[in-house]
Amino acid sequence: MKKLPLTDSAWLTMESDTTPMHVGSLQLFELPNNAPDDYLQQLMQRWLTFDEPQPPFNQKLVYPLKGLKQPHWDTDTEFDIGYHVRHSALPRPGRVRELLVLVSRLHGSLLDRSRPMWELHLIEGLEGKRFAIYTKMHHSVVDGMAGMRLLQSSLSERADQLDQPPPWAMQRAPKKPSKRSPAEAGEEAAATALPKQMLGNLAGNAGSIPALISGGRKSLGADRKIKAVAPYQAPKSLINQRVSKARRFVAESYSLERIKAIGKQHGATVNDIVMAMCAGALRRYLSEHDALPDKPLIGDAPVSIRPADQAEAGGNAISIILMDLATNEADPLKRLARIRESMQAGKDKLGAMSRKQILNYTTLVMLPFTIGQLIGTAGRVRPMFNLVISNVPGPKKSLYLNGARMQGMYPVSLLFNGQALNVTVTSYVDSLDFGVIACRRSLPQVQRLLDHLEASLAELEARN
């Protein structure tokens, strides 16, 4: 058995019927030119023969019978491959619209905690001789970046490779010995122990709260001159409502070369342009609904602090940067300048900290957010930030599944109470793939955000 870290188990604690805590991915593939009519049936039949999955795909939760101890991961000895791997077909005409409706529905349902917490859906019937794969895994198992790496591991850069195992059957390379010194390892262990105390039993360990606050203050002490956005400066907005079960997922791809050119034109990075696109789109969307706050929206940009040699490791290794989205600024160039300045300040803040300090800081900042989810105040009080906007680097070369080229890879993230919208972006070869997930009830016509993203990009493109 493997003990579930308390920082990971927080995702289980925050989960409810209306806030599933899983992350997903939608991958689009084009059928090979010589694919037989039963190509997908053959693929599915082959996959079902891989019924002895590797970790973390064979791990399920086991709860101790006595006390309030944390659950453990243990191998599922009754693993049912037919439950986890499913075959679906779209109704005609099989447009992307029908695909997104299906993904929206699938993403709104909870994963079964009595089984390993993941599902993969092979979806046929997509127009243009294409098919799709939708996968979801619980956030207590992987964070978004690790999940993406796990899925990529089963794809090949060779179109002629037809024997690649599916992701759940891939043999993982053994972990490399840590290159950190004993002092560094001890520092990380001490840092990790503190959030575990806090998330494990807050009431029973109240004495640890001053220690956490002290650690967080020390983490911030070295960079007080850095003008980064502070938590809980975000205005209440249409986005920050309590959420229902129903989800609406929309997706779009944008040329990476185009975005790079616009960034070069304005002395900005690709990430700066992505954030400016989102800010401009949000300004337009909220203005359409007569709901644009006077104060700027604040975005949360998660950043990975996972060591490079642990790219496919399970669990979570993330911190956050809070940024001014400048949605109260009408001029797109001034808006971009504010976003760049805010992002740089956030990076400087984290850059001035050790890994221990980053973990202390992240726990201190996120603890009230987590408590708000648990006690029901989220969505009813001023938000810590308005929405999460993630930008995750992806593959730089085309990838293939059994000869089928992957056309796009769209992240499908999660929502919280008080956070009815999430935008996650990943790069793939020469494109940036945007995945937008929203509460269907709280945010009407969320597909309009795609039009506004393009309008915001064109607006920056037109300015010299």
Predicted features and spans:
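Generic start-of-chain signal for non-secretory N-termini
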Residues: 1-22
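Soluble acyl-CoA-dependent acyltransferase catalytic core bearing the H(X)4D motif
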Residues: 1-7, 26-38, 44-419, 423-454, ...
